[in-house]
């Protein structure tokens, strides 16, 4: 059903073109579905310094969690929490196409860990539009035999 709906998605207008008019997911729709506030600070990764750091050598999801989960202590360390948030953002919130944790979400994870009021619904909305556009491009390439 989703693939059928994507046939109505227009990349240039980022809208579904239906018989009764155009339709698009809005920031309020994302906020309602995810229970995230549509307000908050805009995420800015530039110039943000933090003392929290961890190893990004092995990024496959399973290995990443095993390497950043301390089983010796019941308390969650800052590094563990940031690693989990990075994993969570990469796999479940922004649904990266890779089978690895995306390093790009580390700064956002650190800011969330430190309690910064980041407006995630704007980021998710943008990611949704980008994913819909990419899905439509993939469908068209498959249908034309390019892929």
Where are these regions (language model features)?
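Extended amphipathic alpha-helical bundle segments that form the ordered cores
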Residues: 121-125, 129-143
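Helix-rich DNA/chromatin-recognition modules in eukaryotic regulators
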Residues: 14, 24, 140-146
